[in-house]
Amino acid sequence: MAAKDVKFGDSARKRMVAGVNTLADAVKVTLGPKGRNVVLDKSFGAPTVTKDGVSVAKEIELKDKFENMGAQMVKEVASKTNDEAGDGTTTATVLAQAILNEGLKSVAAGMNPMDLKRGIDKAVIAAVKEIKNISRPCEDSKSIAQVGTISANSDERIGNIIAEAMEKVGKEGVITVEEGSGLEDELDVVEGMQFDRGYLSAYFVNNQDSMSAELEDPFILLVDKKISNIREMLPVLEAVAKSSKPLLVISEDLEGEALATLVVNNMRGIVKVAAVKAPGFGDRRKEMLQDIAILTGGTVISEEVGLNLEGATLDDLGTAKRVVVTKENTTIIDGAGAKSDIEARVAQIRRQIEETSSDYDREKLQERVAKLAGGVAVIKVGAATEVEMKEKKARVEDALHSTRAAVEEGVVPGGGVALVRALQAVSDLAGDNADQDVGINLLRRAMEAPLRQIVANAGGEPSVVVDKVRQGEGAFGYNAGTEAYGDMLEMGILDPAKVTRTALQSAASIAGLMITTECMVSDLPEDDKKGGMPDMGGMGGMGGMGGMM
C-alpha cells in the first residue's frame, strides 16, 4: 500500500477551502442575467462556451490533492442539486462557499464545529419551511414561460417554446430536446403513442409524398414472437380482409414467406396492411407490447399465456383512429382502449418508477407513462454555429428541468429574493447554546450570498441592494437585468421553489461536513523518477582496436 500524506486541523482546512474557492469563483461568474460566460477547453474539437454552473464545475480538477478534495466536494453540491431539481447549481455553489467560509472563521475563533453544524441544520429546516410557505402554484402558461425564460438566461423564446410544448402534451408528456437543422427553434408535437420502429418493407408505403404508410381506422395485431410461416396468420388475415379494414402487424419480427405474402396482398389491394417490429428488447419489449394492447384495446398474442396466432380472432385485435408508419417511426393516434384501463396501467408504471433504483430504468418508465398519458413534443434547437448550438441546447435542457420543478412544487420570487425573505424565519430561531446561535447566524449571512453575487455580476453595489431588498416585503426585489426595484412576480422573475430549496439543503449538507473536518488523508505526490530505467552509466572507452586493415 502506498504511503499517505496526512494533514490535521487548520492546515488541512486551509487547503480544502482554497480548492472550494477556486471552483466556486469559476462557477459564480455565471450567476444572474448579467452573468459572464466560461470557456471550456476540450481535448478535441472547438472549445465549449457555457453559462451552466454544473458544466463548469464538472470540468475542474486541481493539481494539489487536498485542494482537489475540497473542489470535488463542492462539485457534489452542484451535481446533487442538478440531479434533484435540474437547475440552481450556481446558487448551490455560491451558498456552499459562503457557509463554508463563514463557518471556518467561527471554527478558527474557537467555536465547536459540531454545534455550528447543528445550528446550521436547524436554520435550514426553518428556511425550507418558509420557502414552501411563500411559494405559489405554477399552473398557467405565462408562469411556465417566465420560469423557462429565467432559467435560460433571460431568453424569452426558449421560455415560450417550453410553455407551448407543455400546453400541448400536458405536464406529464415527454418533451425532448434535439439539435435542429436551421437557425430558428422549432416545436414538433406528436399526438398519441410513437415508437422508434419503421415499416419492414417499403412496399407498404401508400403515401408517396411523405413516404409513409397511413392506415385509417385499422385493426392492430400484436404478436410476441417472430412470424415466418404465413399459415399461422391466414385465419386472422382472412377475417380482416372480410371486414375491409386495414391491418397493422406489430411483432418481434416478420420475415420470409409471411412478409412476402403481406406485401403481395397489400400491392394487389386485397388487404391494406403494414408491418413493424415491436419496440424495445427482452422484457421491456413485452411490457411495451402490453402498453400498446391497453392503448388500443387489443390482446398480445403470446404463447407464454397460452394464446397462439392460429387461434386469434378479430376480438383479439386492437383498433385506433389512425396509424402512420414512416421509415423510422410508428405513431398510433387515438387508440380505442378503455380510459380506466389506461389510467390503471399508468398508475402501475408510476409505482415501478418509485421503486426502481436505476436512472436508466426510471427514464424508460417515464417515457412509457408519457406515451400512455400524453403525447411527445420535440424541441429542435436552431443556431448559427455548432458551438452556439451546444450552448443553447444545454440552456434549453436546463430551462425544461426548471419548469418541471416549478410545476411540481410551485414558484417563489427569483433573483435571490426568496432566500432573503426566508431570513425572517431564521431570525426568530434560538439554538441550545451560544455556538449553535453562531451557526444559525452564519447561515443567515450566507443566504444573502446569491443576491450579492447577482448584483456584483451586474456591476452594482451588493451591500446597498441587499439592504434595500431586506427592508421591502413579499416579492419586492432587484431586477439586475434592468437595474430596477419592484415586484419580482410582476416582472416575471420567478424561481422554482424546489430549485431554491434543493440548493440550500445540498449546500448546507456538504458545507456542514467540511466545517467538521479535522483530518485529511491523500496519496503522496509521485516522484517523477520513480519507475524509470536505472542509470546505466557510461559505456567506457573501447580500448585499442589492434591492427584492423
Curated annotation (Swiss-Prot):
Location within or outside the cell: Cytoplasm
InterPro entries in UniProt: Chaperonin_Cpn60_CS, Cpn60/GroEL, Cpn60/GroEL/TCP-1, GroEL-like_apical_dom_sf, GROEL-like_equatorial_sf, TCP-1-like_intermed_sf
Keyword Chaperone belongs to the record: yes
GO cellular component terms attached to this protein's record: cytoplasm
UniProt-annotated binding residues for ATP: T30, L31, G32, P33, K51, D87, G88, T89, T90, T91, G415, D495
Broad class of where this protein is predominantly found: cytoplasm
EC number, as in UniProt: 5.6.1.7
Source organism, top-level taxon: Bacteria
Family: Belongs to the chaperonin (HSP60) family.
Function field: Together with its co-chaperonin GroES, plays an essential role in assisting protein folding. The GroEL-GroES system forms a nano-cage that allows encapsulation of the non-native substrate proteins and provides a physical environment optimized to promote and accelerate protein folding.
PANTHER family the record matches: 60 KDA HEAT SHOCK PROTEIN, MITOCHONDRIAL
Subunit structure: Forms a cylinder of 14 subunits composed of two heptameric rings stacked back-to-back. Interacts with the co-chaperonin GroES.
Record protein name field: Chaperonin GroEL
Species this chain originates from: Hahella chejuensis (strain KCTC 2396)
Gene: groEL
